[in-house]
């Protein structure tokens, strides 16, 4: 009987190994050997799925964006526009050691975007998507959409502060929630005046 291989699972374990290497050594430290060690697999398995280091790194970038998007969608189910907006903004704040690794990998890709146009396009699209979703959620909530870019930028800045240890994650979450609550109360006041 032929062995059934789950190719998606194998690609996923390779990507997780890649992220482990990136979190410890940066993208410059990525080699097939290092990823194989981190994932506990053979170099041959990596070569079966990825022809080059660049292809692997690019796949890892797409996977981190797709994973964050899926997680956000899952966590937003059943929430109203204001609650989804808060979830969108606080989602990148690293609140666990595992999530801190993921955010550090995100920022490694962000730095790489300066020299790799393919990664730059993925990152640009993800960052633009966050801003556009914030604007759409504000529109749905009846608030001025102009605040979407400001809130997205605030989330990015607070994420960096938490990642570098300059701010506690709970403080960053509190700031973002307060900003959204302020907009919500202003929007309520605007609706009452209309």
Regions found by a protein language model. Name each.
Residues 51-55, 76, 80, 93-97, ...:
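Residues in soluble alpha-helical coiled-coils and helical-bundle/repeat scaffolds
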Residues 59, 70-102, 147-151:
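Hydrophobic alpha-helical connector segments
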Residues 89-92, 106-110, 151, 155-158:
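Short alpha-helical scaffolding segments that buttress acidic/His motifs in well-ordered protein cores
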Residues 69, 98-107, 114-141, 149:
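Amphipathic alpha-helical packing segments from all-alpha helical-bundle domains
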Residues 119-128, 139-194:
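Hydrophobic/aromatic-rich alpha-helical bundle segments in the mid-to-C-terminal region
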Residues 13, 17-55, 59:
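Helix-turn-helix
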Residues 7-18, 35, 60-64, 68, ...:
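Generic hydrophobic, amphipathic alpha-helix propensity
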